[in-house]
Amino acid sequence: MSQCPYQASQVDLSDEGVHWDQDISYGQYLDLDAVLKCQNPRSDKHDEMLFIVIHQVSELWMKLCLHEAHGAANSLMAGNLSTAFKMLTRVARIQEQLIKAWEVLVTMTPADYAIFRDDLGQSSGS
């Protein structure tokens, strides 16, 4: 049986530690109260929550994609190619996540969507 490949690490972590800010929790840092209140279905149909969450998550991924693309452009202009490459690699991974998100959405059939589509008004593309 082989040993864990990380067991004999050459990295000295003796001066590393977990840095805790006692004044802020994980939920506070991420502003989870606000984020989790942003899903407001217009109907009582079960699948509308899926529709909302998938689209909100996609918007957040796209926001991060733009943030990384701008950072990469700034790094390129500064001649920092390795940082730009890292950021562009991150953009590619974000795009992979966006594509994978559709695998969840396709579990909702067109008939499922049609049940609450009228409740979305003009936001539904109608």
Model-derived segments and spans:
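Surface-exposed peri-terminal alpha-helical interaction modules
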Residues: 1-126
